[in-house]
Amino acid sequence: MRIEEDLKLGFKDVLIRPKRSTLKSRSDVELERQFTFKHSGQTWSGVPIIAANMDTVGTFEMAQALAGFDILTAVHKHYTVEEWAAFINTASADVLKHVMVSTGTSDADFEKTVQILALDPALNFVCIDVANGYSEHFVQFVAKAREAWPTKTICAGNVVTGEMCEELILSGADIVKVGIGPGSVCTTRVKTGVGYPQLSAVIECADAAHGLGGMIVSDGGCTMPGDVAKAFGGGADFVMLGGMLAGHEESGGSVVEENGEKFMLFYGMSSESAMNRHVGGVAKYRAAEGKTVKLPLRGPVGNTARDILGGLRSACTYVGASRLKELTKRTTFIRVQEQENRIFNSL
């Protein structure tokens, strides 16, 4: 047993210090980035935000809507090959450019992903997702995926420490997914006592990944556009959003009605709701590590996407970053004990 004395921080613990700026307008800020990935050699340009691979977020409908904003969608792994084929037949090449194919690490997952990727060469992203990216089996699966798909861009996670980021990048991952427990419907931290404050995880993992020519995506912990800006400021190359994109027309959750008001169900992918839906219930040897919430219907996701991108542009103007790429270089975090004036929050 050992105790690390260093203070670890989440998004709520900091604000970004404003700096002099020569920008005249938020419209002067360029949010699009261009990346060439370490292993695949592929080049991609777009806004580096990803809709999470949850079945109440990462839907085909979400991918269609967010592609119009140049945003990626990690489509959840529970669609069948036939459903993928139907989607590809109606989707444009521009939409497919903004799609990640998600998979688990079982043999069945691998075989299904092989079939999906064979449907269209425009599917260039694979998202290998497990709750705990620290297992030897997971590292071996990433290496297997790299061997099978040498020209596909592979995103793999989740982990929260630099040495594991390095391990995954050396095993074939182009992008490492960072985050254990920060999600809005994740209960891993309270069920297991395991986790890592998200901002510190991003800063440390970005440092490790960039040293090897890899990249990271900050997955979880964002509750507002300012948190997205903080994740990019901390060094994240991409930011993945779940709860912020849930509850919309494109989100895919079941709609329930209470007292004349309609709500959409949103749940974590390790929740009892998810396991009942996809694997026939919670196995006797495990506990559910997610919760189910009812969200008021939020309308089309486009309005939320515009709000997030507008907040991100504004953050860049406050620190003088004319491009999103410059935000991390111009970010100075200050530790705080309050984020906002809450006097009217209950109204």
From Swiss-Prot:
Complex and partners: Homotetramer.
Organism field: Salmonella paratyphi B (strain ATCC BAA-1250 / SPB7)
GO CC terms, sorted: cytosol; GMP reductase complex
Keyword NADP: yes
EC number: 1.7.1.7
Positions annotated to bind K(+): 181, 183
Family the UniProt entry places it in: Belongs to the IMPDH/GMPR family. GuaC type 1 subfamily.
InterPro entries (alphabetical): Aldolase_TIM, GMP_reductase, GMPR, IMP_DH/GMP_Rdtase_CS, IMP_DH_GMPRt
Domain of life per record: Bacteria
Gene name as annotated: guaC
Keywords in alphabetical order: Metal-binding, NADP, Oxidoreductase, Potassium
GO molecular function: GMP reductase activity; metal ion binding
Name this protein carries in UniProt: GMP reductase
Residues annotated as catalytic: 186
Species classification: Bacteria, Pseudomonadati, Pseudomonadota, Gammaproteobacteria, Enterobacterales
GO biological process: purine nucleotide metabolic process
Catalytic activity: IMP + NH4(+) + NADP(+) = GMP + NADPH + 2 H(+)
Residues that hold NADP(+) according to the record: 108-131, 216-239
Cited NCBIfam families: GMP_reduct_1, PRK05096.1
Function: Catalyzes the irreversible NADPH-dependent deamination of GMP to IMP. It functions in the conversion of nucleobase, nucleoside and nucleotide derivatives of G to A nucleotides, and in maintaining the intracellular balance of A and G nucleotides.
